[in-house]
A protein has these predicted regions:
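Non-catalytic, surface beta->alpha helical segment in thiol-disulfide oxidoreductase systems
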Residues: 72-121
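Receiver (REC) domain alpha4 helix and immediately following alpha4-beta5 loop
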Residues: 64-65, 97
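A short beta-strand-turn-helix
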Residues: 1-19
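The canonical Cys-X-X-Cys-His
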Residues: 29-32, 76
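Short active-site neighborhood of thiol/selenol oxidoreductases, capturing the structured segment around
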Residues: 15-29
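Thiol-based oxidoreductase modules, predominantly thioredoxin-like and allied folds used
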Residues: 24, 43, 48-64, 70-72, ...
């Protein structure tokens, strides 16, 4: 599976259960820039088959992110369909990100509902974001 994605246009489709794994970062952040290749390598592993992997510069997509403002970078965000299941800063170590992505991917329906509820209503909807650094 390619880590590259196309620009998403318009409103998300109802009933879409596509996985989205995003790294929310900022172009000015040196840590984020250094993390880019490792994030792309994780995408190439196919941890969540069929998932869209996005590298998101929060300043370039501020309008789409609404009120969401991370306290630190980089942020791992994982969403399935309309449910954002995980959105938090993690140390930029591939093993940590891999374990979290695998854990989120293994959630059953009831667990996913509980995880999504803990994030609240101001969480971003990853379905409206685009990949800022393809490849």
């Amino acid at each position: 599976m390619s880590a590259d994605t196309a620009v998403v246009r318009g409103a998300p489709a109802a009933g879409d259960e596509t996985w989205i794994v995003a790294c929310l970062c900022a172009q000015w952040c040196g840590i984020c820039r250094a993390w880019h290749d490792a994030f792309r390598a994780l995408a190439a592993e196919g941890l969540l088959p069929g998932a869209r992997w996005l590298w998101v510069d929060i300043e370039q997509q501020a309008d789409a992110l609404g009120d969401f403002e991370p306290e630190n970078f980089p942020v791992l965000a994982v969403q399935r369909g309309e449910r954002l299941l995980y959105c938090a800063t993690l140390p930029q170590q591939s093993a940590n990100w891999r374990r979290m992505i695998e854990a989120v991917g293994a959630l059953d329906e009831a667990q996913a509902r509980r995880w999504a509820q803990t994030l609240g209503e101001h969480a971003p909807d990853l379905r409206v974001l685009r990949d800022d650094l393809p490849g």
